[in-house]
């Protein structure tokens, strides 16, 4: 169950990141911000984030998801069909988010986050790197 709490946001991100090129920019932005807001709320509820941590999580997700989306759109615009490249970009940005979370969260929050599925996601990213 905990695994799905992490995988569902990642899957949702991929569901809106790849078909974004067919949407209007306003729709893309709205959809991304709704996703980010839900993820911040989820992390706040699960980890008991303080206000300043919520701010940093929101800022991190906003920056990194936009950057990841831009990279994915560039690949899509170039008509790249190699799915491994899309996965590599997603993994790079998810690793960046986890690295930032580790600096933001307390040790207790990090352990809780790590056990809630982040550790499994990290192992999967590590497998794909090999």
Protein language model annotation of sequence segments:
Residues 1-27:
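Bacterial Sec-dependent N-terminal signal peptides
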């Amino acid at each position: 169950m905990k695994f799905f709490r992490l995988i569902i946001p990642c899957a949702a991100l991929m569901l809106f990141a790849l078909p974004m090129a067919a949407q209007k920019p306003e729709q893309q932005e709205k959809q991304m911000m709704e996703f980010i807001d839900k993820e911040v709320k989820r992390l706040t509820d699960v980890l008991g984030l303080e206000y300043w941590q919520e701010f940093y999580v929101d800022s991190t997700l906003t920056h990194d998801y936009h950057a990841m989306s831009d990279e994915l759109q560039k690949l899509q615009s170039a008509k790249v069909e190699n799915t491994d490249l899309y996965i590599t970009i997603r993994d790079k940005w998810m690793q960046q988010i986890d690295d930032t979370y580790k600096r933001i969260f307390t040790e207790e929050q990090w352990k809780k986050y790590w056990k809630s599925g982040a550790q499994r996601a990290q192992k999967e990213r590590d497998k794909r790197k090999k």
